[in-house]
């Protein structure tokens, strides 16, 4: 597969569009971008690595969620400027919990009614991105000077320190709810979300995995869900 790497004109192309297809089902899973370094990692490890344009860094697919992609074959197009990764997908490819990122279908047949463009999604994309971005910022703060970063100092305190703050923030939210103070409720809830994310980062658990657990519970009564924990 190293021949693929050498055929790309990296001086001309900084990023190569990379289509990801599941080997067994032949389903298109996602579209990502490969840089010279990410493709090199992909070819060396046989695990899919990509370059994130939003975060400006290389990331391994499934590095936090565990939904990794084992590369079985790489295809290069006739112009040497786009790739296809043929993979074995562990879990799902899409952060919404769908198997593929391409789960919205719009028919060109006039006799078929298209779903509305603003169709509801499993997770509101904007909200998810805020949680995901904040989580990765927290991860980046881990190695900073604890005298200059509150997040770094909190992570340095470990589970006891973080747990104490989560309990404290949850209590403040409860008081705001009791006082029916809408502004305070929103403010304290944001504080609680942040400290929960710090706790998740301590254990390297992404918000995606929590959202997947919430999705699993959808359509199931709370009584049934609690009863299932006893087995």
From Swiss-Prot:
CDD domains documented for this protein: NTP-PPase_HisIE_like
Family stated for the protein in its record: In the N-terminal section; belongs to the PRA-CH family.
Main location: cytoplasm
GO biological process per UniProt: L-histidine biosynthetic process
Reactions listed under catalytic activity: 1-(5-phospho-beta-D-ribosyl)-ATP + H2O = 1-(5-phospho-beta-D-ribosyl)-5'-AMP + diphosphate + H(+); 1-(5-phospho-beta-D-ribosyl)-5'-AMP + H2O = 1-(5-phospho-beta-D-ribosyl)-5-[(5-phospho-beta-D-ribosylamino)methylideneamino]imidazole-4-carboxamide
InterPro entries found in the cross-reference section: His_synth_HisIE (IPR023019), HisE (IPR008179), PRib-ATP_PPHydrolase-like (IPR021130), PRib_AMP_CycHydrolase_dom (IPR002496), PRib_AMP_CycHydrolase_sf (IPR038019)
Keyword Nucleotide-binding belongs to the record: yes
Organism of derivation: Helicobacter hepaticus (strain ATCC 51449 / 3B1)
Xref: Pfam families: PRA-CH, PRA-PH
Protein name: Histidine biosynthesis bifunctional protein HisIE
GO cellular component: cytoplasm
Gene3D superfamilies: MazG-like (1.10.287.1080), Phosphoribosyl-AMP cyclohydrolase (3.10.20.810)
Top-level taxon of the source organism: Bacteria
Pathway it works in: Amino-acid biosynthesis; L-histidine biosynthesis; L-histidine from 5-phospho-alpha-D-ribose 1-diphosphate: step 2/9; Amino-acid biosynthesis; L-histidine biosynthesis; L-histidine from 5-phospho-alpha-D-ribose 1-diphosphate: step 3/9
Phosphoribosyl-ATP pyrophosphohydrolase: region residues: 131-231
